[in-house]
Amino acid sequence: MGLIAYFDCPTGISGDMCLGALVSAGVPLEYLMEKLAPLGLTDEYRLTAGLVQKQGQAATKVEVKLLNDHHSHGPGHHGMRHLPEIEQLIKQANLPARVSRWSLAIFHQLAIAEGEVHGIEPEAVHFHEVGATDAIVDIVGTCLGLDYLGIDQCYWSALPTGSGTVRAAHGDLPVPVPAVLKLWQTRQVPVYDNGLTGELVTPTGAAIAVTLASQFGPKPPLNLHKVGLGAGSKDFPLANILRLWIGTEITPHNHPLSSEAPFGQLETITVLETQLDDIQPQAVGYLLESLLHQGAIDVFTQAIAMKKSRPGILLTVLCAPENQNHCLNLLFRETTSLGVRVRQQQRYALEREWQTVVIPHGPIRIKVAYGYQAGKKIILNAHPEFADCAALAKATGQPWQLIHQQAIGAWSNLNKELSPES
């Protein structure tokens, strides 16, 4: 079973904090140096790691020490590489396949954000935030560390905004800097003010999180194997440490109370809600079909009484987090709603599959749902597909109810573990 990683970022995130947490979690510094060497940058930096104290807590501080002050050189120097040059370095470095894929994706996201801020194409971005040697080492090194530990999925906490200003290549910028805001916007990252002043999330850290995160928010259920602690450079009243939680996801297969575990798999869904009192009734059916076509898991309406005693409907949309924006935009485009409530909820969903049975009148698909009890897979229910039964009833002139009963009987004969009545 693959591992999942949760990046707990109470004081923010930067590339060197990611590296520190990964080294703390067991990634050898020598491994990173060996795998980074084919990038051809070893004459530009030195990679070091050591324990430091942050508010009385020990954490690993990884530093990318630049040699000969590479940041001080002009645009023609390697510290100001363009995106295509960085992509070429990564592609030629013989990195593990997913390390290369992750690294390229992170740099592409970062270049898009920086390009939008400056009004240029991503390929034309050449300022130090993307091209600096330390950014390359931070990003590729983080991907190498995740691959070394066998991480399959990454999750991130909500991120703190910070405040104040920071000195950048183009002068003083407000915190969060524009590129970080652009990156957050692409994933609608949950952010909050933790009261700390300064830059807490760097463009490199934001790009890593936005690109690799399966989800932002609370910790997923996991069996915790180890914790890595990565120290930041600044000192705050709160320990400036990124905490990397590594473990296996809790499923019905490995639940610590397997005999009492829920049958279903825990997953996160997005719930969209809006009240409507002026939509044409004919448009409601079209809207529901459009939302399902757009990727909604389910859509339903409830009759409600609104202000001024007007009758209306409460429209609820369930969708996967990655389909949230598609469904949200469709709601605004196809209704008169001026606001939609959004929340994340967890649900237990049964594993399911399609089986086909053949009755005297033709084939019928059966949706079969499974659960796990004490580590054993069991069938919980099975239902003939309504559309198949309806189509066969129309084609043969037989009652729909007869077709449905015959399908259940045929499936039950093939699967003695569950009787039709149970």
Swiss-Prot record:
Keyword vocabulary terms for this entry: Nickel
InterPro entries reported in the protein's UniProt record: Ni_insertion
GO MF terms held by the record: lyase activity; nickel cation binding
Keyword Acetylation: no
Statement: the UniProt record of this protein carries the keyword Repressor: no
Transmembrane segments: none
The family this protein is said to belong to: Belongs to the LarC family.
UniProt protein name: Putative nickel insertion protein
Organism: Synechocystis sp. (strain ATCC 27184 / PCC 6803 / Kazusa)
Biological classification of the source: Bacteria, Bacillati, Cyanobacteriota, Cyanophyceae, Synechococcales
